[in-house]
Amino acid sequence: WIASQTHGYETVAFLSRDGYLPMKAYQIACRYCKELPQAEYLYSSRKALLPEMIVTENDLYDIPVEYHNHTPRTVLDLLSFCTKEYTDKQLKNDGFIGHKTFATRMEFNQFVRYVIEKLYDFESHKQSSDLVKRYYAEKISDKTIAFDMGYSGRIQAAISRAVGHGIDVLFVHGDSK
């Protein structure tokens, strides 16, 4: 299926982590069909692409996490690319317990508001975004098609934003979210 969809491309970028085994199978096929585009494994975790997933401060409310599995500390770890240094004492003084999981969406949203007002660092975010853009600009050209197992398409949208143009993607699974 992948081979039949890649005519005109030079590279198939298999997105980590789900793309690893399909890439290995594709590489076996490439041994027997030399005209297939080359395979490349492309690091593409949500955490690595967060600088491009978060375009405005309001996007912080929609970071790709299940809030009830996270604490202020774990959220700040994810957002370390765009937040100032903090201490547990500072969090506590401002009404948050660093290791306590969020019980409700409202509690999570209150913490995000706090991050925006007190800890968000635009300049750090810009530097991280520039780094992501440089990485993907070196890896993705208009002759590259990406392969991913699928789901929401947020990873591909972030990569497209990073490289400054839409990327073609082969999905195995789509999600309506």
Give residue ranges: language-model regions.
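Long, low-complexity, Lys/Arg-enriched
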Residues: W1-K177
